């Protein structure tokens, strides 16, 4: 969902009053060093490095003050997004599922770091590089919604089970909305590296 004021205005009309969400289906997930196919006819494939937290025990009605007790660890997601499809869905008023759930569009990993190994999960530098050139550098401290906000909100009525994962949302710096966006969208042959300080680097290769 929305995690920064830096996303383009046609993706977010205003900052929501509470965390928003969508689902990444299991069928779209891929691993570290995965080769992800850019579907034919798609030209606006964007990158979104995101911090993921993994639930360690069942949470229902969790409070912000105790939220971190439910978190087992953290990892990285590159929330690959087909803007061709997403922008059409946004324009029609529907949620953007299709452009985020194409097979392979959920690179995840390469490992889960236990939460006790992270001194401050709200002060981690996140970067995204394409072919060795840095495209993005942001800090988790700039996120609107913290892990505690997200878990309290979604566990209010829905039981969150051990093993469930929440990706904490897109930072600013993605290709969409930039003047040279057409040059920045991912193309076959591109190697994308999403890194989060203290966690690891997740690498993905785009192919035809």
Identify the meaning behind each predicted range.
Residues 6-134, 207:
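Active-site microenvironments in enzyme catalytic cores
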């Amino acid at each position: 969902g929305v995690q920064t004021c830096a996303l383009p205005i046609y993706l977010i009309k205003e900052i929501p009053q509470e965390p928003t969400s969508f689902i990444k289906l299991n069928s779209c997930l891929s691993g570290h060093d995965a080769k992800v196919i850019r579907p034919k006819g798609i030209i606006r494939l964007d990158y979104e490095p995101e911090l993921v937290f993994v639930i360690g025990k069942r949470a229902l009605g969790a409070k912000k003050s105790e939220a971190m007790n439910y978190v087992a660890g953290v990892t990285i997601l590159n929330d690959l997004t087909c803007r061709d499809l997403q922008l059409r869905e946004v324009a029609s008023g529907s949620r953007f599922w299709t452009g985020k759930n194409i097979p392979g569009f959920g690179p995840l990993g390469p490992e889960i770091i236990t939460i006790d190994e992270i001194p401050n999960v709200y002060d981690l530098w996140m970067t995204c590089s394409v072919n060795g050139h840095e495209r993005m550098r942001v800090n988790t401290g700039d996120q609107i919604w913290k892990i505690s906000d997200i878990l309290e909100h979604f566990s209010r009525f829905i039981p969150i089970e051990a093993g469930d994962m929440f990706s904490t949302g897109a930072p600013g710096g993605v290709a969409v909305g930039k003047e040279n966006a057409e040059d920045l969208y991912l193309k076959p042959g591109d190697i994308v590296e999403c890194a989060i300080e203290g966690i690891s680097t997740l690498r993905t290769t785009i192919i035809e």
